[in-house]
A protein has these predicted regions:
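Short, well-ordered beta-to-alpha junction loops that form the rim of enzyme active sites
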Residues: 147-149
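Active-site cleft segment of glycoside hydrolase catalytic domains centered on the general acid/base Glu
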Residues: 154-155
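N-terminal pre-domain/capping segments
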Residues: 2-137, 141-143
Length: 155
């Protein structure tokens, strides 16, 4: 075989294969196989995927579901507006996901508060717990992490 003929045939064959491959790319560009759900119930929180889903909390939830997550954890849920909480609850329900834990934060976590026995701390804590029950109803939560504050080290 002559070198010139070999190079021509190889060039022609490569061009045909490249064209065939390039034509098949648009056919699969829109299709994306959904990720299988995790066997363990991992629950990421908002902000973990903000670069992959920059459109806000709903887009992040959709991205989480697309990646196979079945739950959400949000330690700052109590600080979100009622509208955001309702939107999160509806979106979780629409995606077949569920709300994982959120934090019941009485606001005095970094000082000795509830264990002092002072009524003002108890009142704030009970008020926060009552508000948390309403938040749990809005987002469909069954679990919460209660943070009552430091304990009295002198006891």
């Amino acid at each position: 075989m002559e070198r010139r003929g070999f190079i021509k045939r190889m060039g022609l064959g490569s061009a045909i294969l490249s064209a065939a491959g390039a034509m098949s790319i648009p056919a699969f560009a829109g299709e994306k196989a959904p990720a299988p759900t995790f066997k363990m119930d991992f629950a990421p929180h908002f902000g973990m995927f903000k670069n992959s889903a920059p459109g806000g909390i709903v887009d992040e939830l959709k991205f989480m579901a697309d990646q196979g997550f079945r739950s959400l954890e949000d330690n700052g849920m109590l600080r979100r507006s009622v509208a955001d909480q309702e939107l999160i609850g509806k979106t979780l329900n629409d995606l077949g996901m569920r709300m994982g834990v959120f934090v019941i934060d009485g606001g005095d976590n970094w000082k000795v508060s509830l264990t002092t026995g002072k009524q003002e701390f108890l009142d704030v804590f009970l008020k926060t717990c009552r508000e948390s029950v309403e938040v749990a109803k809005r987002v469909g939560a069954k679990w919460a992490t209660v943070v009552p504050g430091y304990f009295e080290r002198n006891l």
